[in-house]
């Protein structure tokens, strides 16, 4: 299932600007925080975004209790999608996609806890230039540690 990419209008209507209303904080400055009505730093939950200086959308993503969690989308300054990441508490999780500025796919990977388990990288003509299509024994161990059974997954890197 393909993630729904929000329009700029949806992002601006439902999110908050990271640069204006959020900051890094919490333990080890690893959380995204905001101030509550008492002026106290609290972990942020919701949709956050950043804009380029010309007002174009640079990034949007979902934050849960201060951590990037769920879909995060990055854009080139021309408005085309640069990268689509799914995250779990700030780590890459599931399918990750990166695009060339012309919109063609640059790479696609499957990640668990931030580690690339499988991937394909393409050149600008669409030719595969590097790939890892089978998990290693270590990948199976890492996946099991995180509760993922790689032997039952049907992962399509397209």
Features from the language model and the residues they span:
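Glycine/tyrosine- and acidic-biased, solvent-exposed loop/turn segments at the edges of beta-strands
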Residues: 1-158
């Amino acid at each position: 299932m393909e993630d729904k990419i929000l329009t700029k209008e949806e992002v601006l209507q439902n999110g908050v600007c990271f640069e204006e209303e959020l900051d890094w904080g919490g333990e080890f400055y690893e959380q995204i925080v905001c101030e509550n009505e008492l002026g106290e730093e609290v972990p942020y939950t919701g949709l956050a975004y950043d804009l380029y200086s010309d007002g174009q959308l640079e990034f949007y993503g979902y934050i849960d209790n201060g951590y990037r969690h769920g879909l995060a989308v990055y854009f080139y300054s021309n408005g085309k999608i640069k990268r689509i990441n799914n995250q779990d508490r700030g780590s890459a999780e599931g399918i990750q996609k990166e695009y060339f500025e012309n919109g063609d796919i640059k790479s696609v990977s499957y990640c668990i806890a931030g580690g690339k388990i499988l991937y394909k990288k393409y050149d600008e003509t669409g030719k595969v230039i590097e790939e890892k299509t089978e998990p290693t024994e270590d990948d199976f161990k890492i996946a099991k540690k995180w509760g993922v059974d790689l032997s039952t997954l049907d992962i399509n890197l397209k």
